[in-house]
Amino acid sequence: MSVISMKQLLEAGVHFGHQTRRWNPKMKRYIFTERNGIYIIDLQKTVKKVEEAYRTMRDIAAEGGDILFVGTKKQAQEAIKEEATRAGMYFVNQRWLGGTLTNFQTIQKRIKRLKDIERMQEDGTFEVLPKKEVVQLKKELERLEKFLGGIKDMKGLPSALFIVDPRKERIAVAEARKLHIPIIGIVDTNCDPDEIDHVIPANDDAIRAVKLLTSKMADAILETKQGEETVTA
């Protein structure tokens, strides 16, 4: 039983690449043809690459590894948050803060601040503080939660990154490569596939395409967790 079908990919519009004038020649091997000035991705290759990525995600999760889902473009934000949460993993779906990986200690200090304010809100501290101060703290909490909420329980560096549109997330890609953290990525015809360890050639601009592929990666993680539950039961 294959992980994904050609029909699913077609229905989600995974095969539509970018305009031919906006392309990276390194993606040529994943392009099937050109139609009306748009590159059409070879979905047979996508099927194989999804299966490879699925196995990789499953193996990392089976070894107890954490995977960080990254996608800050509008088309990816919702799917990244939903699927990472469903899989019990971490995510960045707003702005990638420089140093999230390469300067993780500093990021952890910001996360500690986030948790401290949350605690103050929960234990009644807000009720005894001046109103003006509470307003400021709530604003700070909102901002920290927006950018760090998806990684606030991440204790250390992730074992791998799953990225939607490595061109958009080039800082995340650079940080992961510097630290030799493997990257699984949805790579469109305008991206450089050489920077990604496990390439999924696909349309990264259609919400349905991003949702479909991201959900398959979450399924891979959940498959191992269900296996663990069966063993413990």
Swiss-Prot record:
It comes from the Bacteria. Gene3D superfamilies: Glucose-6-phosphate isomerase like protein, domain 1, Helix hairpin bin. Pfam families: Ribosomal_S2. GO terms for biological process: translation. GO terms for molecular function: structural constituent of ribosome. One of its GO terms (cellular component) is cytosolic small ribosomal subunit. InterPro entries: Ribosomal_uS2, Ribosomal_uS2_bac/mit/plastid, Ribosomal_uS2_CS, Ribosomal_uS2_flav_dom_sf. Keywords: Ribonucleoprotein, Ribosomal protein. PANTHER family: 30S RIBOSOMAL PROTEIN S2 PROKARYOTIC AND ORGANELLAR, SMALL RIBOSOMAL SUBUNIT PROTEIN US2M. NCBIfam families: rpsB_bact (TIGR01011). Belongs to the universal ribosomal protein uS2 family. This is Small ribosomal subunit protein uS2. It comes from Bacillus mycoides (strain KBAB4) (Bacillus weihenstephanensis). The gene is rpsB.
